[in-house]
């Protein structure tokens, strides 16, 4: 609970010279007894199964916190989604946020820390869909045409830790003018490798075999990266203070775009009543 203090792990006290990490060595997958002191001084013990890796849990917490920040700052009008890579995990995360996001008035696409892969064409195809109309049935809700098309404006956030296919999708988002690109210049590493050769000791060699060319940048994405439309720095004190000026600027930009180009669902209360065709 908030305010509880961890004082012991497995019966051993946590202190200035004994960290929780030290007491959790070799405990992954095992049941571990944790003892907490509550704010009123009483003790509470729980048994948990220690994880091998907490990065997925920390990632989910970060994404959900960002989503909550966006939801509260926009009164529920804007959807936030993060794409961690351009492989299976990133493709799943994209659809987790995007399919629920097409009904919102605005969309923030977070490409920061994207480690690359190969599925950016599939994601760009979805982001580039323009809502042209609606399919309206007699009883059901109106469905956007084309399906899974974004209702309102989009903005994207990127940074210096987005690379490879993360570079490429940042570049294409900007090149196709899907919305403003906010943050810092990307990593600039679009030459791909292929781990095809295994060594006798179990190691693997890789060699550069792929690159990227576009009509706008030519070959210059490598070693240069993608310049954002709006540069916003993340300072060390921002990390320490839990402040995200890049996300704050993205929220401000998408709200501005929504004000200038307000998305609006047409009024379908009056359905067409066409007469029967005349004979002859």
What annotation goes with each model-predicted range?
Residues 103-105, 134, 214-280:
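In a subset of proteins, long, contiguous C-terminal domains/tails are tracked
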């Amino acid at each position: 609970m908030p305010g509880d203090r961890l004082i012991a792990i497995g019966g051993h006290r946590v202190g200035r010279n004994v960290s929780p990490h030290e007491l959790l060595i070799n405990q992954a997958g095992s049941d571990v007894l944790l003892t907490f002191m509550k704010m009123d001084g009483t003790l509470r013990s729980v048994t948990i199964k220690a994880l091998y890796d907490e990065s997925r849990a920390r990632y989910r917490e970060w994404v959900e916190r960002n989503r909550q920040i966006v939801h509260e700052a926009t009164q529920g009008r804007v959807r936030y989604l993060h794409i961690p890579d351009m492989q299976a995990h990133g493709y799943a995360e994209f659809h987790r946020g995007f399919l629920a996001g097409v009904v919102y008035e605005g969309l923030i696409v977070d490409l920061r820390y994207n480690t690359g892969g190969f599925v950016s064409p599939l994601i760009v195809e979805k982001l580039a869909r323009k809502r042209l109309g609606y399919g309206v049935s007699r009883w059901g809700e109106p469905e956007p045409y084309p399906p899974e098309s974004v209702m309102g404006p989009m903005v994207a956030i990127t940074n210096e830790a987005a690379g490879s296919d993360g570079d490429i999708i940042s570049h294409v988002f900007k090149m196709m003018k899907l919305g403003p690109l906010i943050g810092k210049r990307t990593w600039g590493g679009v030459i791909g490798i292929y781990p095809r050769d295994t060594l006798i000791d179990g190691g693997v060699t890789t060699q550069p075999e792929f690159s990227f060319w576009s009509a706008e940048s030519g070959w210059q994405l490598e070693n240069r990266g993608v310049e954002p439309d709006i540069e916003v720095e993340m300072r060390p004190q921002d990390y320490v203070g839990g402040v995200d000026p890049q996300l704050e600027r993205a929220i401000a930009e998408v709200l501005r775009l929504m004000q200038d180009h307000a998305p609006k669902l047409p009024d379908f209360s009056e359905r067409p009543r066409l007469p029967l065709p005349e004979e002859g």
